[in-house]
């Protein structure tokens, strides 16, 4: 079980990312565009640097939906490998069966 503060901080980061996502995309498009003037590109870079660090998507950590475990995360289920195995054995995941060959 992850600390509640870590889970809360990650949720806060998700909210910040959502708030700044549109503006960040606009600024990055300006920076990448080869037809942009050097002055506009520099202004866009400065504005991007002024935004909070937590506005970047890469700072959000994928965590287990049940207990917040940060490692062994399976995107398809939104769970860690440990929790996915437990729930699959109990039959709580529809369409998931134990493999046999």
Curated annotation (Swiss-Prot):
Disulfide bridge map: none
Top-level division of the source organism's lineage: Bacteria
Concerning InterPro entries, the annotation shows:
Ribosomal_uS14, Ribosomal_uS14_bac/plastid
**UniProt keyword annotation of Transferase present:** no
Q: Could you state one GO cellular component term attached to this entry? A: small ribosomal subunit
Which Gene Ontology BP terms does the record give?
Answer: translation
Keyword annotations for this protein? Ribonucleoprotein, Ribosomal protein, RNA-binding, rRNA-binding
Tell me if Lipoprotein is a UniProt keyword of this record: no
GO terms of molecular function: rRNA binding; structural constituent of ribosome
Its quaternary structure?
Answer: Part of the 30S ribosomal subunit. Contacts proteins S3 and S10.
Q: Which family does it belong to?
A: Belongs to the universal ribosomal protein uS14 family.
Q: Which HAMAP family match?
A: Ribosomal_uS14_1
Xref: NCBIfam families = PRK08881.1
Q: What does this protein do?
A: Binds 16S rRNA, required for the assembly of 30S particles and may also be responsible for determining the conformation of the 16S rRNA at the A site.
Q: What is this protein called?
A: Small ribosomal subunit protein uS14
Organism of provenance = Corynebacterium efficiens (strain DSM 44549 / YS-314 / AJ 12310 / JCM 11189 / NBRC 100395)
